[in-house]
């Protein structure tokens, strides 16, 4: 008996771009485990698996609250349709909540939701009230507060008629508005997951190494060539996944490492929120 449904196959196709039969086989071999199925499709050579998996059907916005150039907050507020995302009250609440986070520094989402907000109501109650008025579920998904020597932000609208759905914060060790802006736009466009190779967890590196080896074998590469092939593919992973390893979008002859070295700055932290993404 199959451990998956037709809806699971459809979802996996949307996430990976792989064919229906390939998705069915991957789900069968993985016992219905989505993560293992995606990994199996990567080994089989499905294109753009990771990039497609980041796509989302969620709606909502990313709100920004920034205090000068040393502190900023990003907050994601979700709704069910883009019609509500355009709603002034929805946008106002998101902006107010981002400001509230900036002032109160809650430790996590549950702490924020249970915090006293206004008129004896908690943040959760205020969200529920607006949800009842608008007629859609509204969810406060996440937030991040960054404080440091120099913090820059970048907000992006995927549709001019909608509020921002992508936001980036970058913390540098010293002020440099031009470089900070370039880095924020770089992060928005190419979505690195880590600052440098040193920041990539060992288990992630080992998993990429294992997938690279399995993929090379699937392609029929000779066993003696595997170490070199695997290292080459790992280097490609680091180039994509780390900010400092990426080519600079304004000048692809340079890496971001070279850009920050020339500017004499250090990237201490970055946050990238896109509506619906992890």
From Swiss-Prot:
The keyword Protein biosynthesis applies. Its main location: cytoplasm. The keyword Membrane does not apply. It comes from the Bacteria. GO terms for molecular function: translation elongation factor activity. Residues 81-84 are annotated as: Involved in Mg(2+) ion dislocation from EF-Tu. It is found in: Cytoplasm. PROSITE patterns: EF_TS_1 (PS01126), EF_TS_2 (PS01127). Keywords: Cytoplasm, Elongation factor, Protein biosynthesis. GO terms for cellular component: cytoplasm. Pfam families: EF_TS. Belongs to the EF-Ts family. Associates with the EF-Tu.GDP complex and induces the exchange of GDP to GTP. It remains bound to the aminoacyl-tRNA.EF-Tu.GTP complex up to the GTP hydrolysis stage on the ribosome. This is Elongation factor Ts.
């Amino acid at each position: 008996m199959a451990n998956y449904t037709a809806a699971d196959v459809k979802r996996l196709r949307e996430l990976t771009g792989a064919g229906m039969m390939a998705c069915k086989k991957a789900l069968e071999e993985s016992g219905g485990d989505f993560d293992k199925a995606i990994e199996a499709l990567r080994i089989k050579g499905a294109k753009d698996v990771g990039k497609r998996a980041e796509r989302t059907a969620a709606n909502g916005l990313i709100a920004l609250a920034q205090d000068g150039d040393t502190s900023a907050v990003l907050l994601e507020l979700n709704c069910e349709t883009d019609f509500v995302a355009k709603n002034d009250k929805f946008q106002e609440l998101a902006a107010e909540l981002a400001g509230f986070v900036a002032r109160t520094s809650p430790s996590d989402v549950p702490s924020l939701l249970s915090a006293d907000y206004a008129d004896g109501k908690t943040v959760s109650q205020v969200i529920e009230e607006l949800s009842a008025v608008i007629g859609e579920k509204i969810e406060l998904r996440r937030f991040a507060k960054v404080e440091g020597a120099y913090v820059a932000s970048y907000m992006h609208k995927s549709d001019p008629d909608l509020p921002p759905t992508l936001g980036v914060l970058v913390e540098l060790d010293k002020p440099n508005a031009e470089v900070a802006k370039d880095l924020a736009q770089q992060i928005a466009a190419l979505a690195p997951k880590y600052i440098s190779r040193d920041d990539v967890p060992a288990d992630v590196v080992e998993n990429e190494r294992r997938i690279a080896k399995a993929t090379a074998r699937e392609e029929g590469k000779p066993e003696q060539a595997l170490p070199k092939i695997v290292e080459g593919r790992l280097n490609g992973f680091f180039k994509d996944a780390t900010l400092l390893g990426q080519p600079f979008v304004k000048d692809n002859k340079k890496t971001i490492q070279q850009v920050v070295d020339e500017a004499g700055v250090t990237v201490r932290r970055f946050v990238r929120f896109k509506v619906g993404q992890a």
